[in-house]
Amino acid sequence: MKPLLLTIALFSLAIAPPARAAESGVRLFMTGNSFHMKTVPALAEVIAAAGIEGHTLVGTMLLGGSRAITLWEKPDDANPAKAALKSGKVDVLTLCPWRQIPDPGVDEFVALALASNPNVRVTIQELWMAFDSPNAANPDVRKDVAEAEKAPTPWDEATGEKLNAIHADYFAALEKQITAINKRNGKPVLLCVPTGHAAIALREQIRLGKAPGIRRQAELFSDRLGHPGAVLVQLNAYCHFAVIYRQSPVGVLAPKTLGGIADADRAPLARLLQQLAWDAVKAHPLSGLGSSQ
């Protein structure tokens, strides 16, 4: 897939209609690592603000540093995700594997979910590279992490063009696995939540001085590894909302707090995050709303 940065970063200020509540909510089970954990409460707040009725969080299975296969291999008696899927009472399952793709656990979870609910949808969160390094996607990530931790991550040196190059191999590998799984099942059961692309677009807006209340790209991250701060968590929540409920988050009431963002900047920044999330979801061909769907 061609880089989406230009499509998203040239984001238009044309007024999009506010998000409209779906007829009914979905039964959601969320799994993932530390790049997904804080999205659980943030997404719940977005869903409530959008007026979705009947949404149910069936459960969560969250483990720092985990791949999907890490969670899959947990014993059945300590695996709430498997138990929930086997019950057939899950409409949407979220996955957020670490960056080593393909991840065989994704295939396993999709197969189990479909076996109990043929109408299930599974989402996979697109990530951003740790330390802004393409090497973060390599299997031998521990050596790369050890080297990278010796110095601060130069978040603010990145341009959109550079970030697209850093993420190119990872994005391509993720899309290849999604496409293969969907082809094998004869339908788009696995959907990409393109937070990685949306994050690149947001960082470009910050670099250009167009993100209310944020002066530096480094403000998006809570550490050198790249764990998300409040703003990036909120962007991820909007991306998930758009894919799960297949509607725009633009116009949803801004959160009451957004990290250290000043009150005067909170609503304009939330609006930017909503638009970038929606642009990314619409542009991605594997989101369920993209051009190839």
Model features per residue range: what roles?
Residues 5-14:
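Bacterial N-terminal signal peptides
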Residues 22-23, 236:
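Boundary of Sec targeting at the N-terminus
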Residues 17-21:
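Sec/Tat signal peptide C-region and signal peptidase I cleavage site
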Residues 26-31, 35-119, 133-135, 283:
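Conserved SGNH/GDSL esterase-like catalytic core that processes O-acyl groups on lipids
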Residues 82-233, 242-244, 251:
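Alpha-helical cap/lid subdomain in secreted, periplasmic
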Residues 208-293:
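Conserved catalytic region of serine esterases and O-acyltransferases that act on ester linkages
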